[in-house]
Amino acid sequence: MKIVDLIDKIPNGNAFYSFEYFPPKTTVGLENLSSRITRMSRNMMPLFSSVTWGTAGSTAEVSIYLAKMLEQHHKIPACLHLTCTNVDKAIIDKALETAKEYGIRNILALRGDPPLNSDHWEGKVSEFEHAVDLVRYIREKYGDYFCIGVAAYPEGHVDSNVPELSKDPLRDIPFLIEKVEAGADFIITQIFYEPEAFIKFENFVRNHSSNALRNIPIIPAIMPIQSYGSLKRMTRLCGCSVPSSLMQRLNAAKPDDEAIKNIGVEHIVDMIKKIMDNVQGRVHGFHFCTLNLERSVALILKNSGLLTKRWKQVESEMEDEKLLRTTRKRLSLDEPAELHNQVVVPSQQPVADKSSNLFVTSKQSSVSGHKDNLTEEAPFSVSEGSGVLGRQANWDDFTNGRFGDPRSPAYGEIDGYGPTLHFPPSEALKLWGYPVDESDITSLFQKHIMSDISAIPWIDEPVEVETKTIAKYLLKLNGNSWWTVGSQPAVNGAPSADPVFGWGPKGGRVFQKAFVECFVNGKDLKDFITKWHDNPQVTYYAGNNKSEFLTNAPKDGASAVTWGVYPGREIIQSTIIAEVSFKAWLSESFQVWGEWANLYSKNTPSRKLLENCINDRWLVTVIHHDFMDKNGLWKVLEIDF
């Protein structure tokens, strides 16, 4: 069903919301996302759900699969995102034809990232330079079959091709009008954390002299705060601002990740209420960028009153009394408060073994086999995280980017951007210049460790304070042409409130095994393997761009390299390294090499150098399992002082 038709059916005084998911990076993550979508769809009843589209159509197959699953299995109207620049027209055509075949009626037409330079697109001329081109194309080819959404930017949009222009939402209005006049039916905004920015934008749009935007549905996008780091990263990538009062609260809460999540929930709830009170009934729906996680979304819906409003609408539409009672029970609307008490059970997760299988509910669940089975009858309190079932459903709520649990639907850098440089070409060239030999690359890695530059292609922010504690070792390792893109020191029981190593709830202790991840040449890798392959204290994973893979880890093995022990809680493993996660990142890491190379024209010294690195280098992760030996890893790597 079309989104605009669904919105038209919302009675006055009621509210709606929708969910956004992104394609997981691993097969088991996709399986667990299916379970999570089932639970969220049944418990929270979104009006529709959308699926993001990877850079240059990189996730096309999985994105379409998820949209089909929403539409046909979960009976939730699906909206498929499509980006048009830097994408072959054949991919767009196939996606649209397949969407129509599966009964998907809604498309969010976006521009996407432009090519880095004229060589990047292999000389092809794209028919789609802007989102409006895609809107026109869909309308011309499919008439009114698809309901088309477009993006708007309450705080303004900065074009990476024209970085000297400052953000100005008013300057963007003519482009928004052009998209609507080309055939767009609804608008979803960029995320924001300043409610006043949206209120001001919405009021201006509604009263624009053209009258073109007076009645079109505008849905504000909401992204819960999952961690301090992810908030900083997302706001930088999206260009949205954060209220100083919110940043003060978050800074005071570091490193308590649970407190940061709760502060985020409170802020979003207040933001929703403020918007609802100041838009004269013109906006009564919100689009939640879930990041494939559910707990914060559930809490926001409950605490803001959106869930209750949505329930009233669904209740009025239900004629089957038995179905009504079942749904009410599942939403816990008739349940006493005692049923929400949290239950703690002993953990079955051994964390100190060299390379144990990953456990969630049983010892038979490995990295490749674990599935989240909390689906059909799980009540809303489970999505909130209450009780033992809630803990099982939200087992991955403390995410850790690409070093997180590969079974999690949220595994990876949860920003939806994929393996890109995250910088406009002009800014990237200022950061990294024009390297012509390997010593230039070594220098860039060392400058990043010393904070002389703010980013390298694989790490788009300054080094953490934790990394600085091992800077002298990393500088020497990079000096040996082992270029590091990830690392951590050994930690034995630091307080969870420690300003450098702490994370998670208060009153706990955190532990870390030392590891390092770097790009090395083939000869150095061979020498390392010859010496350390059979050492029980060392696990390594190595792969290159030719699909060659080497490891001394057991099949389906995984190493928990960061874990926390907290009062009244099961042990939480926030950082896990396994073959499945290494291979997912391996592919992306070499794509980043390619993105960097594409900054430079063909046959230039810099382009040739980086292409040689793609062909000759191996990505290697080395773990030292004795977390009580702070220097163990560096002895293995022969980095002595």
UniProtKB/Swiss-Prot annotation:
Keywords noted in UniProt: FAD, Flavoprotein, NADP, Oxidoreductase
Disruption phenotype: Leads to partial auxotrophy for methionine.
Residues at which FAD binds: 52-53, 81, 111-113, 153, 172, 179
InterPro entries in alphabetical order: FAD-linked_oxidoreductase-like, Fadh2_euk, Mehydrof_redctse-like, MTHFR_C
Residue positions binding substrate: 113, 190
Protein family: Belongs to the methylenetetrahydrofolate reductase family.
Function, in words: Major methylenetetrahydrofolate reductase required to generate the methyl groups necessary for methionine synthetase to convert homocysteine to methionine. Performs 15 to 20 percent of the total methylenetetrahydrofolate reductase activity of the cells.
The protein, known as: Methylenetetrahydrofolate reductase 2
UniProt source species: Schizosaccharomyces pombe (strain 972 / ATCC 24843)
Gene: met11
